[in-house]
């Protein structure tokens, strides 16, 4: 019996070091037919059961758990394994041939496998009539990989995998393992050293934190009921359509008795609220799996798995489906820039810098203590793009807000001289990231038609939303960080000093049409000591609420799509805390309820009047009437839609002084209705305004033959539209 086993091989198997288990285990041709070797540490006996029912007891080998015996030259067999606690009847994992096709492996190695989680990861499948799970992981520099889990007592000796050399992929079909099984990969590095057990980078389901295992996902697809939405999505998300985004952190939007809602509970509460408020979209802070809740999801490790914090992957699909049925789009924040250093994650995955750059000047982000993806490696960029498509296709997500784009575009981002590596031309631009982002956006347009990508890009990088064919990055929209910074600084000033900073109010129109913009009042503006949006407003309580209402009125009438973080819509007075729910009890206060009503009305106004959204990206949709009245801190402008759309007049008074008889030219005569007034009593204001309507007078002003004499409420915004 001992001549059936090489001593070096048996030691390597017993020590979980052997890198080519298929060369030893399973049935191999012999002089008497086939020699079957199996390794089941802890087993007391093993019998091979042939297809005709005959049984071949296997003899114990030189190491505990090793068994071998002679089988006929042909025919299938199963194993009957005697354990101390009972008997297991199963197929032999080492009786199956290579699983992934050569074409799959080619696509993986080229970074072009767009359904990557159908090839890699854990897929519950049937092979040769046997049900089980196919495990596959990219680890080209590992000397050995085994899958460990609750199905093999987490024993790295039990299920070593086969290396498919052309792509660096290790694979194994494990019979009888199905959805719900917990697993990880146990790898040895290129020199044989054992690495920390790794979660599956392509797992479609993950264990609830603080657990770090991956879970075999249920392959049953969600039964979607959103055909109507998907058929009209491209129109709903077109550049000339209204887009008002409500950004939320799913774990802290609403807490009941200190507990997070699951996806179904969130859908029950959130969707009716968003619909009532008039938002067109919800934007979820990252829902990909992440180890540390305090990162808010911006340091993810499971880029193919919706986080288990809110339930199952199908629960997330149900949430999206229900949003769509109510006419609400779903955008998710997505992080392809960097990842955390947790030992069970992507860091030094196979004992080398696989997903990250090896040089810390390229591969380590000191601001966040994270590792930076190597976008120049085909397999890594392909991994990220496949993650994007996973959420856009599998979960019908309508858009990705791509996080930290500026940190990817510049090699010297947040680095001093000598701390970064120039590109091949000696410059700071990251050519590899540029190529990655362009390909991402091209792939999204082709394979997720109607979906959008939104860049959080904080610099003046040119052409972020320009077509790739024109040298741009190809995003659909970009956050207008300049507008946000300038206007928040302006509104935070005492009105006495605003006259000296008037340009901060008007400068955004200089570049408003250089990109397709979203105006973001995001979570970033209510954390890290910045306080709340209401807390930034100067003055006493009356002035603070009036300033907030005026600021929101300005935001909703300024060119650009809108994004508002949860809590801002009712004037949350404290900084956001992800460990606590929003202070919904404040809606018992008429002042906060008034802000909420104002935001609801602004959303409906914005959607109702094409002039406020149809030409957000076209200079013909905006005309200054008054942009230089710094002394009174007043601005006035016309918003214009397409031919036949009524114009809208917007007037803003950023002082607490009432302006009487403030005359403004208008492009047509007749009655102009006051369709919005931030000082209305229903919003908590003093009800100062123009009695609901003003009739134009034949007095020329601002290049127009007709003009309106207006009362401008203090710290207020009024919007007028011509009757009929």
Curated annotation (Swiss-Prot):
What's the EC number here?
2.4.1.18
| InterPro entries the record matches | A-amylase/branching_C (IPR006048), Branching_enzy (IPR037439), GlgB (IPR006407), GlgB_N (IPR054169), GlgB_N_E_set_prok (IPR044143), Glyco_hydro_13_cat_dom (IPR006047), Glyco_hydro_13_N (IPR004193), Glyco_hydro_b (IPR013780)
**What are the record keywords, sorted?**
Carbohydrate metabolism, Glycogen biosynthesis, Glycogen metabolism, Glycosyltransferase, Transferase
One GO term in the molecular function aspect is: hydrolase activity, hydrolyzing O-glycosyl compounds
Protein's UniProt keywords contain Transferase? yes
Keyword Glycosyltransferase on entry: yes
Provide the top EC class: transferase
Annotated Gene Ontology cellular component terms? cytoplasm; cytosol
Functionally, this protein is described as follows: Catalyzes the formation of the alpha-1,6-glucosidic linkages in glycogen by scission of a 1,4-alpha-linked oligosaccharide from growing alpha-1,4-glucan chains and the subsequent attachment of the oligosaccharide to the alpha-1,6 position.
Question: What is the name attached to this protein's record?
Answer: 1,4-alpha-glucan branching enzyme GlgB 1
Q: Taxonomically, what lineage is the organism?
A: Bacteria, Pseudomonadati, Pseudomonadota, Gammaproteobacteria, Lysobacterales
């Amino acid at each position: 019996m001992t001549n059936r086993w090489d001593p070096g091989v048996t030691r390597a198997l017993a020590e979980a070091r052997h890198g080519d288990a298929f060369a030893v285990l399973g049935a191999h041709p012999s002089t008497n037919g086939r020699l079957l070797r199996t390794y089941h540490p802890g087993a007391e006996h093993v019998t091979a059961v042939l297809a005709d029912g005959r049984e071949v007891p296997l003899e114990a080998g030189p190491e505990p758990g090793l068994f071998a015996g002679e089988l006929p030259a042909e025919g299938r067999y199963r194993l009957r394994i005697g354990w101390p606690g009972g008997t297991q009847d199963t197929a032999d994992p080492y009786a199956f041939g290579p699983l992934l096709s050569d074409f799959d492996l080619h696509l993986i190695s080229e970074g072009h496998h767009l359904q990557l989680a159908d090839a890699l990861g854990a897929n519950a499948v049937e092979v040769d009539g046997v049900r089980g799970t196919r495990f596959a992981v990219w680890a080209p520099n590992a000397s050995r990989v085994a899958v460990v889990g609750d199905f093999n007592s987490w024993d790295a000796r039990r299920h070593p995998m086969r290396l498919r050399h052309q792509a660096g992929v290790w694979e194994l079909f494990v019979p009888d393992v199905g959805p719900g099984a917990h697993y990880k990969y146990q790898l040895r590095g290129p020199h044989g050293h054992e690495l920390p057990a790794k979660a599956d980078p392509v797992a479609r389901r993950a264990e609830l934190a603080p657990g770090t295992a991956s879970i075999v996902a249920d392959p049953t697809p969600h039964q979607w009921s959103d055909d109507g939405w998907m058929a009209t999505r491209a129109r709903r998300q077109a550049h000339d359509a209204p887009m008002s985004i409500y950004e939320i952190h799913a774990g802290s939007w609403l807490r009941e008795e200190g507990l997070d809602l699951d996806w179904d509970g969130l859908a029950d509460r959130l969707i009716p609220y968003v619909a009532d408020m008039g938002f067109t979209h919800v934007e979820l802070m990252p829902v990909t799996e992440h180890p540390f809740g305090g990162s808010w999801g911006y340091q993810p490790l499971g880029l193919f798995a919706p986080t288990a914090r809110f339930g199952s992957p199908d629960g997330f699909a149900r949430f999206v489906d229900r949003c769509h049925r109510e006419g609400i789009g779903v955008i998710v924040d997505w992080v392809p820039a960097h990842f955390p250093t947790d030992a069970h994650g992507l860091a030094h995955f196979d004992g080398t810098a696989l997903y990250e750059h090896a040089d810390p000047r390229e591969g380590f982000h000191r601001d966040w203590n994270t590792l930076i993806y190597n976008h120049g490696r085909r397999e890594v960029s392909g991994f990220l793009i496949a993650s994007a498509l996973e959420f856009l296709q599998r979960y019908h997500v309508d858009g990705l807000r791509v996080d930290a784009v500026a940190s990817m575009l510049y090699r010297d981002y947040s680095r001093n001289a000598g701390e970064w590596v120039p590109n091949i031309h000696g410059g700071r631009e990251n050519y590899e990231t540029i190529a990655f982002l362009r390909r991402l956006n091209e792939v999204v347009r082709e394979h997720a038609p109607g979906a959008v990508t939104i860049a959080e890009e904080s610099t003046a990088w040119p052409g972020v939303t320009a077509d790739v064919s024109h040298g741009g990055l190809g995003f659909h929209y970009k956050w207008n960080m300049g507008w946000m910074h300038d206007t928040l600084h302006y509104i935070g000033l005492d009105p006495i000093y605003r006259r000296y900073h008037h340009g901060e109010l008007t400068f955004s129109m200089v570049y408003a049409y250089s990109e397709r913009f979203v105006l973001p009042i995001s979570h970033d503006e209510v954390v890290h000591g910045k306080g709340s949006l209401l807390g930034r407003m100067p003055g006493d309580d009356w002035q603070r609420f009036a300033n907030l209402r005026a600021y929101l009125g300005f935001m909703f009438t300024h060119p650009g799509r809108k994004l508002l973080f949860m809590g801002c819509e009712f004037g949350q007075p404290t900084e956001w805390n992800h460990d606590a729910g929003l202070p919904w009890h404040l809606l018992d206060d008429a002042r906060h309820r008034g802000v909420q009503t104002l935001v609801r009305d602004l959303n409906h106004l914005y959607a109702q009047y094409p002039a406020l959204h149809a030409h957000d990206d076209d200079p013909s949709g905006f005309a200054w009437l008054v942009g230089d009245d710094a002394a009174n801190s007043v601005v006035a402008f016309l918003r214009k839609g397409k031919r036949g759309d009524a114009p809208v007049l917007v007037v803003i008074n950023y002082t607490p002084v009432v302006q009487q008889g403030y005359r403004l030219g208008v492009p047509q005569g007749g009655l102009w209705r006051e369709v919005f007034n931030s000082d209305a009593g229903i919003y908590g204001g003093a009800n100062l305004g123009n009695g609901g309507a003003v009739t134009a007078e034949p007095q020329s002003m601002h290049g127009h033959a007709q003009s309106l004499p207006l009362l401008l409420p203090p710290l207020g915004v009024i919007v007028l539209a011509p009757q009929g």
